């Protein structure tokens, strides 16, 4: 069954900084708790990650999945679709970066997911919460720290 979640957060960093953190997939293991390994398999004409394999912690084990990134709506939106995954049938989503008047950014994260194995509702909700925590809260911490350092 497809599950969809959307969450927004204000980040005290400009949109360029937030976007750069999201685009720098090779550094995800530095700040995204559950991401253990990243391999960029293909870049687009502008040098941005286009096809990326991830190894992540999930359900007490390791999972591997490959995402195809779409930058056609950049700089405001970065989106991705699952190419293949061992525990997921669908893992599609997007980030949007909306500059605010005070220099901050409203970051929206949307995810559509379907697992390949059945799980109880409470486990799915816990997993969604953990993904959102990493996708937004840990991105916020990383972007704000980078912004404070002038990056």
Which residues fall in each region the model found?
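Short, surface-exposed charged micro-motifs
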Residues: 8, 39-40, 68, 94-96
């Amino acid at each position: 069954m497809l599950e969809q979640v959307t969450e927004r957060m204000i980040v005290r960093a400009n949109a360029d900084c937030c976007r750069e953190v999201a685009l720098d997939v090779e550094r995800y293991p530095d700040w995204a708790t559950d991401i253990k390994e990243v391999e960029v398999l293909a870049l687009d004409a502008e040098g941005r990650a286009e096809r990326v394999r991830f190894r992540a912690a999930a359900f007490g084990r390791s999972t591997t999945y490959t995402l195809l990134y779409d930058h056609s709506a950049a700089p405001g939106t970065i989106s991705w679709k699952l190419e293949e995954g061992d525990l997921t049938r669908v893992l599609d989503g997007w980030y949007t970066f909306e500059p605010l008047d005070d220099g901050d950014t409203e970051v929206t994260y949307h995810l559509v997911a379907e697992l390949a194995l059945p799980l109880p509702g409470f486990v799915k909700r816990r997993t969604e919460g953990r993904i959102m925590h990493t996708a937004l809260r840990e991105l916020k911490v990383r972007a704000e720290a980078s912004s404070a350092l002038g990056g």
